[in-house]
Amino acid sequence: MYRALRLLARSRPLVRAPAAALASAPGLGGAAVPSFWPPNAARMASQNSFRIEYDTFGELKVPNDKYYGAQTVRSTMNFKIGGVTERMPTPVIKAFGILKRAAAEVNQDYGLDPKIANAIMKAADEVAEGKLNDHFPLVVWQTGSGTQTNMNVNEVISNRAIEMLGGELGSKIPVHPNDHVNKSQSSNDTFPTAMHIAAAIEVHEVLLPGLQKLHDALDAKSKEFAQIIKIGRTHTQDAVPLTLGQEFSGYVQQVKYAMTRIKAAMPRIYELAAGGTAVGTGLNTRIGFAEKVAAKVAALTGLPFVTAPNKFEALAAHDALVELSGAMNTTACSLMKIANDIRFLGSGPRSGLGELILPENEPGSSIMPGKVNPTQCEAMTMVAAQVMGNHVAVTVGGSNGHFELNVFKPMMIKNVLHSARLLGDASVSFTENCVVGIQANTERINKLMNESLMLVTALNPHIGYDKAAKIAKTAHKNGSTLKETAIELGYLTAEQFDEWVKPKDMLGPK
């Protein structure tokens, strides 16, 4: 249902019915207002751009055009860290929408008023679809449990549901952010649940498709270059021959293994903490709530989510995210190697290795006319470096779960999602703007191969290692060819050299 929703939609205009309409709404009147609230506490300030809302610490001004409430405003006041670029990642917010919808549906099964439940579900759907993104201003750098973001979601869904039912924003009547939207939930189990939902969706919609695209393009190049024999390099020095296709096949296998590692980490990501509430005991939930919520989330996303078998682990440790981040870190190592190889093999065009001709995408220098650079390789290697750094942060966060709760949750999921998005997007960019357009410079490849001293390795079985080494060293010292030197030293004839030193016969075991 939600898997294809990626574009941000504009928030709906706020249309509010008079508060009096609430009292006349069948089945919705009579909800109590907390005794510490002044009369008409949530009434709009008619001459101002804000309304007054209350939390347990007192009153706060809330912008009239926002669905969030007092706790969200208080968080924006207390955590002015980083600005808009550090806001909670959109995938987390959308994941919360999915979770809150699932919870409302299950709570209805356990007796929640259907009118309230349906309004919550409709509002939660809008959150999941990205229609209310402008109402989530909180940054990652807040409480380590993500409580403020959970309440931000609760307030937005509550007020949007209230609006749908003709009520007054901020009144918490008939839909209360805690009693109804957060029913049978705690921030301690909802935030890790949203983390796993967001990570799983990002992996399936962005990361794995990007890697698959790169894998297929590299595989096509490996087949295209299957007959091109080139000199190999070890320690960055000349080695024995292989085909360019064989070289690329190594890259293909690296990306294949990357996808395998990521998929292998996913079963733990599919385990959801929902139902554990505050410390993992499931206090204030009903028997079966956790299983039903996981099943609803699975149905909504099309992914095989299940309830976590041990909620204490699910709240206090986030080893599953560390594991996934580790798989992405290994992927970054692979992509760093692949991108570096390709840019070095394409170095030049006249003074480098020059074995590959890379696509020319844009001017490369503001001072050197005609210069073109391997920018896609550079972007990929920067992405790889960033992912490696992200993994360090995730590792530190994952190792700091204390007693019954890990309080590095927002930072961890920010970095996991960042890595997944960067690797997926970079793989697509690298594929479309570099890999598919790579050409082999066969003239240069042949020249370098025929000049290589390491072809002498083919003589080992015939004249022995020591004599072969002397041929190579003498040829290098004198600037002569292997063939000329071998004949001059009297180790073999021209005919023997031509018979034994054939690059095409040096590509595999005999």
From Swiss-Prot:
Q: Which domain of life is it from?
A: Eukaryota
Enzyme class comes to: lyase
The effect of S187A is: Does not affect phosphorylation by PRKDC
Q: Where is the transit peptide?
A: 1-44
Altering S46A: what's the impact?
Does not affect phosphorylation by PRKDC
Marked site: Important for catalytic activity? E378
**Could you tell me the Gene Ontology terms of the biological process aspect for this record?**
arginine metabolic process; DNA damage response; DNA repair; fumarate metabolic process; homeostasis of number of cells within a tissue; malate metabolic process; positive regulation of cold-induced thermogenesis; positive regulation of double-strand break repair via nonhomologous end joining
Residues with the N6-acetyllysine modification: K61, K66, K80, K94, K115, K122, K213, K223, K256, K292, K502
Tissue-specificity statement: Expressed in red blood cells; underexpressed in red blood cells (cytoplasm) of patients with hereditary non-spherocytic hemolytic anemia of unknown etiology.
User: What keywords would UniProt list here?
Assistant: Acetylation, Chromosome, Cytoplasm, Disease variant, DNA damage, DNA repair, Lyase, Mitochondrion, Nucleus, Phosphoprotein, Transit peptide, Tricarboxylic acid cycle, Tumor suppressor
- Where are the Phosphothreonine modifications? T85, T90, T236
The pathway to which it is assigned is: Carbohydrate metabolism; tricarboxylic acid cycle; (S)-malate from fumarate: step 1/1
How is this protein organized at the quaternary level?
Answer: Homotetramer. Interacts with H2AZ1.
Any extra remark in the record? There are 2 substrate-binding sites: the catalytic A site, and the non-catalytic B site that may play a role in the transfer of substrate or product between the active site and the solvent. Alternatively, the B site may bind allosteric effectors.
PANTHER family recorded for this chain?
Answer: ASPARTATEAMMONIA/ARGININOSUCCINATE/ADENYLOSUCCINATE LYASE, FUMARATE HYDRATASE, MITOCHONDRIAL
Disease linkage in the record? Fumarase deficiency: A severe autosomal recessive metabolic disorder characterized by early-onset hypotonia, profound psychomotor retardation, and brain abnormalities, such as agenesis of the corpus callosum, gyral defects, and ventriculomegaly. Many patients show neonatal distress, metabolic acidosis, and/or encephalopathy.
So what does this one do?
Catalyzes the reversible stereospecific interconversion of fumarate to L-malate. Experiments in other species have demonstrated that specific isoforms of this protein act in defined pathways and favor one direction over the other.
Q: What is this protein called?
A: Fumarate hydratase, mitochondrial
